[in-house]
């Protein structure tokens, strides 16, 4: 079932799953990340740590997107207001270029 909260996430090419978090709680999940409380906790901690790396003093979050790249997949993290959107996306293999 698609809700307004997740409809954009479900259209991302090569996505393997997603999480929508608010204050560490899972609001929505799907695919490989469905009901993954451990991933939600780790990502919440990662976002909190990244927010501590402010170069300029201010109340704004110091980043818009955060990518954690693994061998076969990438976790794409976007913070919007009080929500954290996480998408697990399959990395595409690059074809060799013939010269």
From Swiss-Prot:
Where Phosphoserine occurs, the residues are: 67
| Annotated GO biological process | cellular response to amino acid stimulus; positive regulation of TOR signaling; positive regulation of TORC1 signaling; protein localization to lysosome; regulation of cell size; TORC1 signaling
Modified positions (N-acetylthreonine) are 2
Q: Which InterPro entries match?
A: LAMTOR4
N-acetylmethionine (modified residue): where? Answer: 1
Q: Which GO terms describe its molecular function?
A: guanyl-nucleotide exchange factor activity; molecular adaptor activity
Sorted alphabetically, the Gene Ontology cellular component annotations on this record are: FNIP-folliculin RagC/D GAP; late endosome membrane; lysosomal membrane; lysosome; Ragulator complex
- Quick check: keyword Repressor in the entry? no
PTM (free text): Phosphorylation at Ser-67 by PKA inhibits Ragulator complex assembly.
> Where in or outside the cell is it found?
Lysosome
Q: Which family does it belong to?
A: Belongs to the LAMTOR4 family.
Q: What does this protein do?
A: As part of the Ragulator complex it is involved in amino acid sensing and activation of mTORC1, a signaling complex promoting cell growth in response to growth factors, energy levels, and amino acids. Activated by amino acids through a mechanism involving the lysosomal V-ATPase, the Ragulator plays a dual role for the small GTPases Rag (RagA/RRAGA, RagB/RRAGB, RagC/RRAGC and/or RagD/RRAGD): it (1) acts as a guanine nucleotide exchange factor (GEF), activating the small GTPases Rag and (2) mediates recruitment of Rag GTPases to the lysosome membrane.
| Oligomer status and interactors | Part of the Ragulator complex composed of LAMTOR1, LAMTOR2, LAMTOR3, LAMTOR4 and LAMTOR5. LAMTOR4 and LAMTOR5 form a heterodimer that interacts, through LAMTOR1, with a LAMTOR2, LAMTOR3 heterodimer. The Ragulator complex interacts with both the mTORC1 complex and heterodimers constituted of the Rag GTPases RagA/RRAGA, RagB/RRAGB, RagC/RRAGC and RagD/RRAGD; regulated by amino acid availability. The Ragulator complex interacts with SLC38A9; the probable amino acid sensor.
Q: What is this protein called?
A: Ragulator complex protein LAMTOR4
Organism, by scientific name, is: Mus musculus (Mouse)
């Amino acid at each position: 079932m698609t809700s307004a909260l997740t409809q954009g996430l479900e259209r991302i090419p090569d996505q393997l799953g997603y999480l929508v978090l608010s204050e560490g709680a899972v609001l929505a999940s799907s695919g490989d990340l469905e009901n993954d409380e451990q991933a939600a906790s780790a990502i919440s901690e990662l976002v909190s740590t990244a927010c501590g790396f402010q170069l300029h003093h201010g109340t704004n979050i110091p980043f818009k997107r955060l990518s954690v790249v693994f061998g076969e997949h990438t976790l794409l993290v976007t913070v919007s207001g009080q929500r954290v959107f996480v998408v697990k996306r399959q990395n595409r293999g690059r074809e060799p270029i013939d010269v």
